[in-house]
């Protein structure tokens, strides 16, 4: 049948065309690479000729004739070609052999490599000391500096060196003694915390201020003269008011009747106003005018005119009268009785009446006595004393 036969022929033709492709590829893949498969030189400077490992040379070798070879015929034998190649190799290899001699010295490298300098360039206060420390004290390994060709390949000159660590036994004073590392007064090496000293001025403290305030009262007390050096100003009026209570009560111008009488009466309480200030300066003053002076009790003396006991104005008397008239305050009854027992043991009956007379002028007048009246009072007291001595 033509239909089936045509179909079979078409099938066989398709198989015949396709089958050789696969079979040939498998057989040709096993062949080895040969010199015939190498392409010819491409004409550029890299592919002018080819030289194999076994010495086979092929390609354009016209450049060999330009270097002194015979340029007779273009077809050369392999031997002549190998001879030319060997000559070329000798000519190319000769210059390296001539360069075996020591070449011109290269410029010397820096004294210290920048890498090494940056590695040890810590902040230093003294740059000169730092340079001397690096160059002088640090020991560099210079044993392999000399090589066979006479050029330094390792060490300080080449920029590569080994910095040895300083021993701990070497102290700063040893370096200072050598002179290579000058000493700096501001920097000191401390091996322990006990030798560390930090000087800081934080200003005056509260304790120092308190001590200064406490030392102020002691200084005036030391500068004040002794009580014995004071002039006996109170003794200008020998007739003490506390020592003569009957005379005060018997005198017509009593303090209660005339407030200004004590300043004019020689036997009045204000006859010796500066007595407390003169006698109580080394003892101190109180805010209310009371004198805090303590001293021996005044001796009682008899007066030929007044007929009563009379004694010098001592510290106790000055304290009593200074509190009664100068300060405008009076002693309590207990203090008055105590002084009465010590100074006037025989005038117990008239003491209470004397206290009542003292209290009257205190409520009426508190004005201090003028200085002029005090001066007149002292003069009057001196005149009265002279009159009493004459009688």
Swiss-Prot record:
Modified residues annotated as Phosphoserine in this record: 19, 27, 39, 65, 73, 77, 101, 113, 121, 139, 180, 190, 192, 195, 303, 350, 353
UniProt key word Plastid: no
Disulfide bond entries: none
Compositionally biased region (Polar residues): 364-377
Membrane topology: Peripheral membrane protein
Biased composition (Acidic residues): 381-391
Residues the record lists as Phosphothreonine modifications: 34
Cellular compartments per GO CC: adherens junction; cytoplasm; cytoskeleton; cytosol; endomembrane system; focal adhesion; plasma membrane
Chain positions of Sequence repeats: 220-226, 227-233, 234-240, 241-247, 248-254, 255-261, 262-268, 269-275
Function recorded in the entry: Probably involved in the organization of the actin cytoskeleton. Induced membrane extensions in fibroblasts.
Assembly information from the UniProt record: Interacts with RHOQ and CDC42, in a GTP-dependent manner.
Domain comment in the entry: The CRIB domain mediates interaction with CDC42.
Name of the protein described by the UniProt record: Cdc42 effector protein 1
């Amino acid at each position: 049948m033509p239909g089936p036969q045509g179909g079979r022929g078409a099938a066989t033709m398709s198989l015949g065309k396709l089958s050789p492709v696969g079979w040939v590829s498998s057989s040709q893949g096993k062949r080895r690479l040969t010199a015939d498969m190498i392409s010819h030189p491409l004409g550029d400077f890299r592919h002018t000729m080819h030289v194999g490992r076994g010495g086979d040379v092929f390609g354009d070798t016209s450049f060999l004739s330009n270097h002194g070879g015979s340029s007779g015929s273009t077809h050369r034998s392999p031997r002549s070609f190998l001879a030319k190649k060997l000559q070329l190799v000798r000519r190319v290899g000769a210059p390296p052999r001539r360069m075996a001699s020591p070449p011109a010295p290269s410029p010397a490298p820096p004294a210290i490599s920048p890498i090494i300098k940056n590695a040890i360039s810590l902040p230093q206060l003294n740059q000169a000391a730092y340079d001397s420390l690096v160059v002088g004290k640090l020991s560099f390994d210079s044993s392999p500096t000399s090589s066979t060709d006479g050029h330094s390949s390792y060490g300080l000159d080449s920029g590569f060196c080994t910095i040895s660590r300083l021993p701990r036994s070497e102290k700063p004073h040893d370096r200072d003694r050598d002179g290579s590392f000058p000493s700096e007064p501001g920097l000191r090496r401390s091996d322990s915390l006990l030798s560390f000293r930090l000087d800081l001025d934080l200003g005056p403290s509260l304790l120092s201020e308190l001590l200064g305030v406490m030392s102020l009262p002691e200084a005036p007390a030391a500068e004040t003269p002794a009580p014995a050096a004071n002039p006996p100003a109170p003794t200008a009026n020998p007739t003490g008011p506390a020592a003569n209570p009957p005379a005060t009560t018997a005198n017509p111008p009593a303090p209660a009747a005339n407030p200004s009488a004590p300043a004019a009466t020689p036997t009045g309480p204000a006859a010796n106003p500066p007595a407390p200030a003169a006698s109580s300066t080394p003892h101190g003053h109180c805010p209310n005018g009371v004198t805090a002076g303590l001293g021996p009790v005044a001796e009682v003396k008899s007066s030929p005119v007044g007929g009563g006991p009379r004694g010098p104005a001592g510290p106790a008397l000055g304290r009593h009268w200074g509190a009664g008239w100068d300060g405008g305050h009076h002693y309590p009854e207990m203090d008055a009785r105590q002084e009465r027992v010590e100074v006037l043991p025989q005038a117990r009956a008239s003491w209470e009446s004397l206290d009542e007379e003292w209290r009257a002028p205190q409520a009426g007048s508190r004005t201090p006595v003028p200085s002029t009246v005090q001066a007149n009072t002292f003069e009057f007291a001196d005149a009265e004393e002279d009159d009493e001595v004459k009688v």
